[in-house]
UniProtKB/Swiss-Prot annotation:
Superkingdom, natural source: Bacteria
Leader sequence residues: 1-21
Name of the protein in its database record: Lanthionine-containing peptide SapB
Any Pfam family: RamS
Free-text description of this protein's post-translational modifications in UniProt: Maturation involves the enzymatic conversion of Ser into dehydrated AA and the formation of thioether bonds with cysteine. This is followed by membrane translocation and cleavage of the modified precursor.
Biological role stated in the UniProt entry: Lanthionine-containing peptide devoid of antibiotic properties, involved in the formation of aerial mycelium. Suggested to self-assemble at air-water interfaces, thus providing a film of surfactant through which nascent aerial hyphae can emerge. The aerial hyphae differentiate further into spores.
Encoding gene, per UniProt annotation: ramS
Crosslink position(s): Lanthionine (Ser-Cys): S24-C31, S34-C41
InterPro entries: RamS (IPR045825)
Similarity section: Belongs to the lanthionine-containing morphogen protein family.
Residue numbers of 2,3-didehydroalanine (Ser) PTMs: S27, S37
Keywords associated with the record: Signal, Thioether bond
Length: 43
């Protein structure tokens, strides 16, 4: 239970960083492999 409690306490920060990482990875994949890359990835 102690491990679960510690994980529950650590999740907010880890989730926010995890979302940023996965978001950037997804955007890179979309830019590389999607036909919408011109629309989504142009500055």
């Amino acid at each position: 239970m102690a491990l679960l409690d510690l994980q529950a306490m650590d999740t907010p920060a880890e989730d926010s960083f995890g979302e940023l990482r996965t978001g950037s990875q997804v955007s890179l994949l979309v830019c590389e492999y999607s036909s919408l890359s011109v629309v989504l990835c142009t500055p």
